[in-house]
Amino acid sequence: MENKKQVWLDFDDFNETNNRLDWLWMLKNEFPHFKVNLFTIPGNCSVSFLDYIKKIKWIQLCVHGYNHANNEDVSEKALRVLVLSYGYKRVYRAPYWQLSDVMYERLKKLKYRIMLHPDDTRQGIKYNWNIKYSPPSSDTLRGHGHIQDTQGNGLVEAFENIMKLPKDTIFKFI
């Protein structure tokens, strides 16, 4: 397994009415080791939908802000509730990549893994492949896109680029 390509693939703005599950299932059917990280706004999903998604073992739900506002400041209590009550993983990506220093420190204190834009100078996880482009030749990729097409990197629009990965690619959770 050491020579196989490893990919951390994530999509922003996953929710109950904007989920592209049919396309995600197509990827799962093509790639035996497929896993995906989906960043969602908690208020955009019903409890029954979250319960359904949690049963799909190759999907990891991550926090994409609390209400998708620019530079929002989510309280520590709200961040704890997301993990304890709704089962979100301690992985956070700020909406619009805008993360205040206060929020950054709060997330670190709560032991969240913080996703940052590649241009951000702070410590965090940064993607190295925008899926609107063909995958680079690197053996380890952190691919990023959106569930819907917002910047040319929507799942449907970039599907062919993902399909260019070797079928034995090992997908990982963040």
Language-model features and meaning:
Residues 1-26, 34-35, 170-174:
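Boundary/entry segment of secreted carbohydrate-active catalytic domains
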Residues 18-27, 75-82, 152-165:
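Well-ordered, non-membrane alpha-helical segments in soluble/globular domains
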Residues 19-24, 44-54, 118-136:
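Alpha-helical scaffolding within the catalytic cores
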Residues 33-104, 139, 143-147:
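Metal-dependent polysaccharide deacetylase catalytic core of the NodB/CE4 family, i.e.
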Residues 2, 31-32, 148-174:
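C-terminal domain-boundary segment and adjacent tail
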Residues 103-136, 169-174:
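His/Asp/Glu-enriched short active-site or ligand-binding loop at hydrolase and phosphoryl-transfer sites
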Residues 127-153:
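A conserved mid-domain beta-alpha-beta active-site/ligand-binding segment of alpha/beta enzyme cores
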Residues 14-17, 69, 147-152:
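Short acidic, S/G/P-rich loop/turn micro-motifs used as interaction or catalytic elements
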